[in-house]
Regions:
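Charged substrate- and nucleic-acid-binding regions of tRNA-handling and nucleotidyl-transfer enzymes
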Residues: 1-60
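Low-complexity, highly charged intrinsically disordered N-terminal segments
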Residues: 52-82
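Acidic low-complexity segments
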Residues: 66-73, 168-195
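Histidine-rich, glycine-flanked metal-binding segment
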Residues: 83-88, 96
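Domain-length cofactor-binding catalytic modules of enzymes
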Residues: 91-94, 101-108, 114-123, 131-139, ...
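Divalent metal-dependent hydrolysis catalytic cores, especially in the metallo-beta-lactamase
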Residues: 147
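Acidic, low-complexity central loop/insert segments
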Residues: 151-153
Length: 471
């Protein structure tokens, strides 16, 4: 008689995990050996004992750093009570963030503002981790980025009209018949990655191509102050595919957190970069970056064709991402990489948009040590969207838009005026520019002065739209 009555039932991966084995390349060999023993009549208790020596030693638990043990650089200053209140909140959350045991350095940019519960990396925040990728520090909008294309002396209105006819704002993707082609090579690469090889990711990679989402994402048309040439600038991220990768990455990081550092804040959980899972996640990030770049490209190219414009230079940069320098992983949450070789396709120039009534800055980073090699990604906020709406009082969104953007062609593609995206909801642009210069974070080489822009607008909650669609 064997040690259990169900000796014909195979040993599965669930058995191995219950016994303490970690999923990985060795799983296949372990399962083969286990089931060979099973076929010989061994019971589960005996098989578990035979394989026990294969269980890797658990790494020691990592406790959070002590308060203030790891400092962070401040590249921001306050000039009024709102700015001071904002900086105090950013300092509080950064102090908690820097207790994460993998972190070795941090910095905040002139556009810094809180982005969640205390301890969450703020917008305009940078965190350098050793051998760790923190999904919560690149956020759900992975690879949120900006791209610019020089359109020569095309008429800005014609370009904005053309762009409005081809872009897509709002939730979800494009319907059949209105989709852009997604690279088959890229889709095949998705299928080879454990984080991206699922029906939902593959479907959204096709449906969301050529879409921009909502919130602060935009399509901007303006003229170069240096050359007088027309340019289009888009701002958006990786849409559904990136959001799903973030969700799966956070779930995996949480499992590691419980094992490696249960006292670390949940939002700061990490995936060990040198683990099999970490290498696969890093590769998934690079594939999402390629998808996001293609997403910008199709909108730009379709606009060029619809406007009949000539094409000059085109470049882009991300500002929600993870960058590797040596042994450290630099997490930028609303922070622009400001060193020349941050990526193989880096041009040396980056874009820093401010608000719909101000120019987009064309900058060359200074790789400042006190910025950990980053510069701002925009203007940032001193108070929340809801507080901004409260301060407007009885003024209508339409009246406020007219007052703040006189002479500009501002359009809301999929909804009413979103007052939380008006210039007054952001920090004063001139102060942000002054601090970029004062802290020597980047050299501003050009200004793309605004003609107009398109944004999603004030949309009803997604669940409300989905509910109406089911009726």
């Amino acid at each position: 008689m064997t040690e259990d009555d169900n000796t014909r039932d195979p040993v599965t991966g669930e058995h191995l995990k219950e016994w303490g084995h970690r999923p990985g390349k060795q799983f296949g060999e372990l399962l083969a050996r286990a089931n060979e023993m099973r076929a010989q009549g061994f019971g589960l208790v005996r098989i578990q004992a035979e394989l026990a020596s294969e269980i890797p030693d658990l790494p020691p638990v990592m406790d959070p750093h002590g308060p203030g043990a790891v400092a962070f650089h401040e590249n921001i200053e306050a000039g009024d009570p709102d700015e001071l209140d904002n900086i105090e909140k950013v300092r509080e959350t950064m102090a908690a963030l820097m207790r994460t045991p993998t972190l070795e350095a941090g910095a905040i940019m002139p556009d810094a503002c809180p982005a969640g519960p205390v301890g969450t990396i703020p917008v305009g925040g940078v965190a350098a981790a050793r051998n760790a990728i923190h999904p919560g520090m690149h956020s759900a909008d992975i690879c949120c980025s900006v791209m610019i294309t020089d359109l020569g002396h095309a008429d800005p209105k014609a370009v904005l009209d053309a762009a409005q006819s081809v872009t897509h704002f709002g939730p979800g993707g494009r319907p059949q018949g209105k989709r852009f082609t997604t690279s088959l090579k890229l889709l095949d690469a998705f299928r080879e990655n454990r984080f991206l090889d699922n029906p939902k990711s593959l479907r959204m990679a096709q449906e969301h191509m050529g879409t921009q989402g909502d919130g602060n994402h935009f399509l901007f048309v303006g003229r170069s102050r240096k050359t007088g040439r027309t340019a289009i600038v888009t701002h958006h991220g990786s849409r559904g595919p990136g959001a799903l990768l973030y969700k799966n990455g956070m779930a995996l990081a949480e499992r590691f957190r419980r094992e490696l550092s249960p006292k670390t804040l949940k939002q700061n959980a990490w995936i060990p970069a040198e683990s099999e899972e970490g290498r696969a996640y890093w590769e998934a990030l690079q594939l999402i970056r390629k998808w996001t770049k293609a997403n910008h490209n199709v909108i730009h190219q379709a606009t060029v064709e619809a406007a009949g414009a000539e094409v000059g230079d085109r470049f882009w940069n991300e500002h929600n991402f993870v960058f590797r320098r040596g042994d450290l992983y630099f997490h930028g949450k609303g922070a622009t990489p400001a060193w020349g070789e941050y990526a193989a396709d880096a041009s040396g120039l980056t874009l820093i948009p401010l608000n719909m009534a101000e120019p987009v800055l064309v900058a060359r980073g200074k790789d400042a040590a006190h910025g950990l090699g980053f510069s701002p990604h925009g203007a940032g906020r001193n108070f929340s969207r809801s507080e901004h709406k409260r301060r407007l009082g009885s003024r209508t969104p339409e009246a406020q838009l007219k007052a703040e953007t006189a002479g500009l062609d501002v359009r809301f593609h999929a909804g009413a005026v979103d007052v939380s995206e008006l210039p007054s909801s952001y920090k004063q642009a001139d102060k942000v520019v002054a601090q970029i210069k004062a802290y020597d974070l980047a050299e501003i080489e050009d200004y793309i002065d605004p003609y107009g822009c398109i944004m999603a607008g004030d949309l009803p909650p997604f669940w409300q739209t989905a509910k109406r669609g089911r009726r």
